[in-house]
């Protein structure tokens, strides 16, 4: 059994097989997931697991170098948006690295998920609570 926080086998495999610049999406319960992209569905019920809890575990598992967000996220769901940015800031402080933050339209975001290695679906029901992580390197 793993000693670290991530117990989900599919997410562990994903993290172990990612290469530099690969993208992974963590999304709310409602984001459409392209048929050709691997779906890792964690959603149990409304809000479980939460978007932020899932992000925290992913950040503890995988090295990132940037994120992509929908422009609408900050305006429609400011509390969740700020919580995500706080997690990103904490990760930057912990790693001593600076991550890029890119905002695109929600429509462009949905199209971009088609390039993700996987989409991790949470039970989050907050509008636009979605992030694309760009994978970095640990060296």
UniProtKB/Swiss-Prot annotation:
The keyword Signal does not apply. Substrate binds at residues 28, 106, 128-130. It is found in: Cytoplasm. The keyword Lipoprotein does not apply. It comes from the Bacteria. Transmembrane segments: none annotated. Its EC number is 5.4.99.62. InterPro entries: D-ribose_pyranase (IPR023064), RbsD-like_sf (IPR023750), RbsD_FucU (IPR007721). Belongs to the RbsD / FucU family. RbsD subfamily. This is D-ribose pyranase. It comes from Shewanella pealeana (strain ATCC 700345 / ANG-SQ1).
């Amino acid at each position: 059994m793993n000693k670290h926080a991530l117990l989900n086998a599919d997410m562990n495999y994903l993290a172990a097989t990612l290469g530099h610049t690969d993208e992974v999406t963590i999304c709310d319960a409602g984001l459409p997931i392209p048929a050709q992209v691997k779906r890792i569905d964690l959603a149990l019920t409304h809000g479980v697991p939460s978007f932020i809890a899932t992000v925290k575990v992913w950040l503890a598992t995988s090295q990132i170098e940037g994120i992509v967000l929908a422009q609408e996220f900050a305006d429609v769901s400011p509390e969740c948006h700020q919580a995500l940015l706080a997690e990103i800031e904490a990760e930057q402080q912990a790693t001593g690295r600076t991550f890029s933050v890119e905002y695109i339209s929600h429509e462009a975001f949905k199209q971009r998920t088609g390039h993700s290695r996987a989409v991790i679906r949470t039970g989050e029901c907050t509008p636009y609570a979605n992030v694309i992580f760009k994978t970095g390197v640990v060296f």
